[in-house]
């Protein structure tokens, strides 16, 4: 995976190092008693996430709006205070279910043993993501942590990848970025001059012809 010219590796967090699906399903079960609406939730998440990436809405307001729209689609119109209450319940359940993928720490530590510098680049609210990194013992694994909610820039914008490279003291061409989203992670990193690696844990994806990125199915 790591060629000789690589001096640093950056990682996405959710669905790359942290099992996003498991914790998100736990949040749905808190709200509905079941996670049968997982597919619907994913579609709604992608729709709202686009607005966040476009700078149309902040991360935490986006989460509340998603919850409001989710229940509206199910015929339940929530007042703002009830939206907040349910989103807080959901978030608490998600936090209780945070866990790393089994290959996350072995990968990070193997790269560290090779002398590589490491960074996390994640699109999320700062407080939420730092709490997650602390709870899972990830903070100490990274030389730099870049969170969109703290910086005002998000993947796939080139600026956040290049800022990570500066923090690590490397040129973009000396860095690799690994993430589960083809567009936001792998292609975004490529466009910023890094080596983009798409982590497709499901094995169901396909790299577009001539994309100039790599694809892996697991971290270690």
Listing of model-derived features with the role each one plays in the protein:
Residues 3-102:
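N-terminal helical cap/lid subdomain that shapes the substrate entry/recognition surface
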């Amino acid at each position: 995976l790591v060629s000789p010219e690589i001096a640093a590796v950056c990682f996405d967090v959710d669905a790359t190092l942290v099992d996003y699906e498991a914790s998100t399903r736990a949040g749905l079960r808190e709200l509905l008693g079941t996670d049968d609406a997982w597919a619907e939730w994913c579609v709604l998440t992608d729709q709202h996430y686009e607005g966040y990436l476009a700078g149309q809405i902040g991360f935490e307001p986006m989460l509340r709006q998603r919850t409001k729209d989710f229940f509206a689609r199910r015929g339940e119109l929530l007042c703002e205070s009830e939206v907040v209450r349910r989103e807080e319940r959901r978030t608490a359940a998600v936090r209780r279910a945070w866990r790393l993928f089994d290959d996350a720490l072995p990968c990070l530590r193997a790269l560290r043993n090779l002398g590589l510098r490491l960074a996390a680049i994640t699109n999320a609210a700062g407080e939420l993501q730092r709490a997650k990194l602390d709870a899972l013992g990830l903070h100490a694994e990274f030389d730099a942590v870049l969170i969109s909610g703290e910086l005002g820039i998000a993947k796939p914008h080139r600026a956040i990848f290049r800022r990570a490279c500066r923090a690590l003291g490397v040129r973009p061409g000396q860095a690799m970025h690994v993430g589960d989203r083809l567009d936001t992670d792998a292609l975004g990193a490529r466009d910023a001059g890094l080596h983009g690696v798409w982590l497709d844990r499901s094995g169901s994806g396909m790299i577009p012809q001539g994309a100039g990125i790599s694809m892996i199915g697991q971290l270690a």
